[in-house]
Amino acid sequence: MTFIKQMMPRYVASMTAGIVAAAMAATCAFAPVANADAVSPTQETIQSTGRHFMVYYRAWRDVTMKGVNTDLPDDNWISMYDIPYGVDVVNIFSYVPSGQEEQAQPFYDKLKSDYAPYLHSRGIKLVRGIDYTGVAVNGFRTFMKEQNKTESEATEADYDAYAKQVIDKYMISVGLDGLDIDMEAHPNDADVKISDNVIRALSKHIGPKSAKPDTTMFLYDTNGSYLNPFKNVAECFDYVAYQQYGSSSDRTARAAADYQPYIGNEFVPGLTFPEEGDMNNRWYDATEPYEESHFYQVASYVREHNLGGMFVYALDRDGRNYDEDLRRIVPSNLLWTKTAIAESEGMALDTAKTAANHYLDRMSLRQVIDDNAASADKARDMVGKAANLYETNKAVLGGDYGEGFSNTYDPTLEAGLLGIDISVLQQQIDKSSEIIGADTAESDAKTALRMARDAAIDGLTGKIYTADQVSAWSQALKAALDATVPVPTPDSTDQNGNRDKVTNHKVQGQPKQLSATGISTDIIVAVGVTLAIAGVALSLSRKLS
């Protein structure tokens, strides 16, 4: 899967290809442009280990939900477009109090129409938790009662029918890919018998035993090592998500050993951030110094022992504290999550520093940088001094939202962009700026050059770009640069009396010229068409980034 396919749904790629075809019909005087098959970093470049990174996304804090499950007046800030790269599973966690369903509906509409297709285009699976006791056990009992039967009379067909009902209600209705059994109880044998059968019935449709193991997912999510509800159906699940909030890697080691006979290394421990309004729990997972934090310990343990991955709960609360933040909703730069992704995936410190400097270099092309509280030079200095991944990322992002060079820098995404060579384009931008600034006189050629340069800068300072887009911007700039060198016009009288031959040759062999400039109008048209096409591709990709 190419990088562009992760960024944009198929319909965007088709639209771009259609625009390219239309432009080619109008003129052939331009270079190949961005398309869905761009040569660019693959998913393997971004996340090559096969380990998972899951985030719990609290739906009631999405920008589309207002006043749901909250008594705080603050506006929500996060959307699913903010989910960092390197995440491959999003667990949608939602509680909608009775009477607030109408206020919550915009999120579920957006999820199905926009969020899910976008995240799918990035290779991300979407799952939703269902309560073990409420759905996997008592839900089935209620289902049987509605048919005037007891649980002891249940047949495989009954379990299959109930499983389809659960999948339709919790998964298909909102465009998701799987379910997560949230087990935080100690069920008795009768309950386990029911849940075993419900889980087996669900596994016919989702997860590793289904007919679609690559496009669906079935998870078991728990906070302990009570194995009775799990051991008989372990093969039905993709992995175990283990809530070890407030605990170091010592607990990871013990719990992973408990589950290893049943699930192997497909064990995914998780940590949490402080939730607003929680006046009781104090987990302190994300605390400096970084290398003493639970985040560093668990991410390192996952990497070193090749476990199934890692997860974080309450993505939007990344970086929050147990003081004033318990009573407010404020934006986050997602520093801890982005670092945990890189740490658990084994990103080398040198790679992290190269990615950070790459980002600073390309963002410095902007004449005005809107969101920086620190200069690029200061950030570069801090990157150079950084001793670990956290310090490297913090050098660019800052310790909290609004404190760094950028609020949105994504180290995993940037590491993927390192595979696209932008050096030639950067040289062309420098050369163009030199020519544009050489004198104040404006001309058609300079206007075209400015347009091409600004489009290239706009593209390179976006969130993401492809190799084909870089090629398009580069070739448009080359055409514009060439157009600033006038084509010599032969004298009106030829010394050898060959005026007619020269004129005829000029008419037949030279492109049309702009009056009094000697600049090819074909080149100017080519620059405009190339930039128009590259610009469309850019605007579409930005819309979804």
Swiss-Prot record:
- Role this protein plays: Endoglycosidase with broad specificity that cleaves the chitobiose core of high mannose and complex N-linked glycans. Is able to release N-glycans from diverse host glycoproteins such as human and bovine lactoferrin, immunoglobulins A and G, and ribonuclease B. Is active directly on human breast milk - a complex matrix of lipids, oligosaccharides, and proteins with disparate glycosylation types - successfully removing a significant proportion of the total amount of N-glycans. Does not recognize O-linked glycans or free human milk oligosaccharides (HMO).
Q: Which organism is it from?
A: Bifidobacterium longum subsp. infantis (strain ATCC 15697 / DSM 20088 / JCM 1222 / NCTC 11817 / S12)
The domain of life is Bacteria
- Applied uses, from the record: EndoBI-1 might prove useful as a novel tool for diverse applications in proteomics and glycoproteomics research.
The keyword rRNA-binding appears for this protein: no
| Thermal properties | Optimum temperature is 30-45 degrees Celsius. Is heat-resistant, since the enzymatic activity is not significantly impaired by incubation at 95 degrees Celsius for 1 or 5 minutes.
One Gene Ontology cellular component annotation held by this UniProt entry = plasma membrane
Report the protein name in the record. Endo-beta-N-acetylglucosaminidase
Q: What class of enzyme is it?
A: hydrolase
Q: Which GO terms describe its molecular function?
A: mannosyl-glycoprotein endo-beta-N-acetylglucosaminidase activity
What is one process in the GO biological process aspect for this record? protein deglycosylation involved in glycoprotein catabolic process
